[in-house]
Amino acid sequence: MTDRVLPEQIRNFGIIAHVDHGKSTLADRILQLTGAVSDRDMREQYLDRLYIERERGITIKSQAVTLQWDCDATQYVLNMVDTPGHVDFTYEVSRSLAACEAAVILVDATQGVEAQTLANLHLAIENNLLIIPVLSKVDLPSADVEGATLELSEVLECRVEDVMHVSGKTGYGVKELLDLIVRKAPPPKGDVTSAPRALIFDSIYDSYRGVVTYVKMCDGTIRVGDKIRMMSTGAEHTLLEVGVSNPEPQSRHSLSVGEVGYFITGVKDVRKSRVGDTITTDTHTATVPLPGYSNPKPMVFSGIYPLNGNEYSALREGLDRLKLSDASIVYTPETSAALGFGFRCGFLGLLHMEIVSERLNREFGLATISTAPSVAYEITPDGEKTLVVMNPSDFPSGKIKEIKEPTVKVSILSPKEYIGSIMELCQARRGVMQGIEYFGSVRAELIYVMPLAEIVFDFFDSLKSRTKGYASFDYNPEGSQPADLVKVDILLQGNKVDAFSAIVHSSKAYSYGSSISKRLSELIPRQQFEVPIQAAIGSRVVARETIRAVRKDVVAKCYGGDITRKRKLLEKQKQGKARMKLIGRVEVPQEVFVATLSSYK
């Protein structure tokens, strides 16, 4: 591949879709068709490099790859970005689309338009990208090609003939799609002669080469050996390697306007390559940075603790190393009386939280326990400043003037026959309906504003079970609203166990308290004395369960005689039990914490 490519011969495009709509399979066929990967080296989900991606069949990290394609007797360079589809990784999609001029919006012919399809479509429109509608999996017997084509054309307000039909499995229509991208997608704009400006759209950590920064060149040219400058921080580094992914790394002498590639400077801290920052050179310095985009804000918070208390420093090191490849993780040290030393971590969503825990286990051999997920509340105590509380243990005591909880705008796409059931579920979760829109004669989109706390537990599972798996949903931050919230503490023999504390709506305090008390009464081993388990709001107990004492049969040796002998032994036992209850401590096995907390994730 020659170093110098004219901007008119470059096409930058992304593939966006709902999870499991065939993005990675289509990307595989494109890699084969363009000759980037030989048939011998080809494997399924070629661009999904993380083992979790391959096991779960989902894309987590975006991948940018440079390909060559001949069309109309001219050779073009195609820069393709394969993006995630799950709602938790919308941020990955948004930053990848900043490197594109066109977006292939892919819809499964067997499923039709889904919630995340619409969310990603809005991202593409916000980035002023050319939209290319494509229907995938058209070769399947269950595909409703005609219905899905009509639905997609209605959503995009385009002609039915504009929707392309492809099959990533057989390769049908893929060549025609690439030709269409070349003919319809606009070439990148930029000035080759002006001061260099490159937009960072991703960065990953490589244990051998340090931070690999993925960039799109917007102006000028940057070469190996140049001293580059980060415009937000002013930090300077010498460029050791420049290249493109084809799809394996391929070093080049330089990158110029419109090209997508990578920079390596030998820096070991990925936080020095902030996504959205602009790179320039110190010899020909740009004065105005490119409009970047903000870092993702965590939506869900949870405490992560090592099962083995001696592995705290190993957990810190593991999180530090994960942060190098996943800049969206946020964590601060915290201490729990029940669980010891750990970290309060912020995640983009529940799937993100699950994947981080799994990576800590697989990559660093760390067995961890996660507390129940919570969100960030704004709490204003009487006469004091507003606090942001992410951990129930930090909930202030005393009189509270106002509590605000974060809300999200939820979009639910479902067949029309389940609308009543979905509305019932959303109302039970304190949702406020904003509108309903019908797509064709079969499907509808319901828009609700809901508290984020109501969807981080089991909303998705409940939605799927009520709609037999047909509904899909997506959400975006909407702001915050005042709410009647309380902190529920769980007490064992009068002592608070902070790991089980939760901030819940006052209407759900009893159900939370009674369910977790019942669960603990089933899991905690019986003691020599009676153990009360109480759920309390402040000093008011709202639910209680009791673990009955293990009782020795002290009168077994009495075979007859005076009844007073038996009474004396029973009275002595009763006094001993009372004394034991005063001084005894309830030992809660670690398995109880694991079992209880895992059931409330």
UniProtKB/Swiss-Prot annotation:
<dbReference type="InterPro" id="IPR006297">
    <property type="entry name" value="EF-4"/>
</dbReference>
<dbReference type="Pfam" id="PF03144">
    <property type="entry name" value="GTP_EFTU_D2"/>
</dbReference>
<feature type="binding site">
    <location>
        <begin position="20"/>
        <end position="25"/>
    </location>
    <ligand>
        <name>GTP</name>
    </ligand>
</feature>
<keyword id="KW-1003">Cell membrane</keyword>
<dbReference type="InterPro" id="IPR005225">
    <property type="entry name" value="Small_GTP-bd"/>
</dbReference>
<feature type="domain" description="tr-type G">
    <location>
        <begin position="8"/>
        <end position="189"/>
    </location>
</feature>
<dbReference type="Pfam" id="PF00009">
    <property type="entry name" value="GTP_EFTU"/>
</dbReference>
<keyword id="KW-0342">GTP-binding</keyword>
<protein>
    <recommendedName>
        <fullName>Elongation factor 4</fullName>
        <ecNumber>3.6.5.n1</ecNumber>
    </recommendedName>
</protein>
<dbReference type="GO" id="GO:0005525">
    <property type="term" value="F:GTP binding"/>
</dbReference>
<dbReference type="GO" id="GO:0003924">
    <property type="term" value="F:GTPase activity"/>
</dbReference>
<dbReference type="InterPro" id="IPR013842">
    <property type="entry name" value="LepA_CTD"/>
</dbReference>
<keyword id="KW-0378">Hydrolase</keyword>
<keyword id="KW-0472">Membrane</keyword>
<comment type="similarity">
    <text>Belongs to the TRAFAC class translation factor GTPase superfamily. Classic translation factor GTPase family. LepA subfamily.</text>
</comment>
<dbReference type="GO" id="GO:0045727">
    <property type="term" value="P:positive regulation of translation"/>
</dbReference>
<dbReference type="InterPro" id="IPR000640">
    <property type="entry name" value="EFG_V-like"/>
</dbReference>
<dbReference type="InterPro" id="IPR004161">
    <property type="entry name" value="EFTu-like_2"/>
</dbReference>
<keyword id="KW-0547">Nucleotide-binding</keyword>
<dbReference type="GO" id="GO:0043022">
    <property type="term" value="F:ribosome binding"/>
</dbReference>
<keyword id="KW-0648">Protein biosynthesis</keyword>
<dbReference type="GO" id="GO:0003746">
    <property type="term" value="F:translation elongation factor activity"/>
</dbReference>
<dbReference type="Pfam" id="PF06421">
    <property type="entry name" value="LepA_C"/>
</dbReference>
<dbReference type="GO" id="GO:0005886">
    <property type="term" value="C:plasma membrane"/>
</dbReference>
<dbReference type="InterPro" id="IPR035654">
    <property type="entry name" value="LepA_IV"/>
</dbReference>
<comment type="function">
    <text>Required for accurate and efficient protein synthesis under certain stress conditions. May act as a fidelity factor of the translation reaction, by catalyzing a one-codon backward translocation of tRNAs on improperly translocated ribosomes. Back-translocation proceeds from a post-translocation (POST) complex to a pre-translocation (PRE) complex, thus giving elongation factor G a second chance to translocate the tRNAs correctly. Binds to ribosomes in a GTP-dependent manner.</text>
</comment>
<dbReference type="InterPro" id="IPR000795">
    <property type="entry name" value="T_Tr_GTP-bd_dom"/>
</dbReference>
<dbReference type="InterPro" id="IPR031157">
    <property type="entry name" value="G_TR_CS"/>
</dbReference>
<dbReference type="InterPro" id="IPR035647">
    <property type="entry name" value="EFG_III/V"/>
</dbReference>
<dbReference type="InterPro" id="IPR038363">
    <property type="entry name" value="LepA_C_sf"/>
</dbReference>
<dbReference type="Pfam" id="PF00679">
    <property type="entry name" value="EFG_C"/>
</dbReference>
<dbReference type="InterPro" id="IPR027417">
    <property type="entry name" value="P-loop_NTPase"/>
</dbReference>
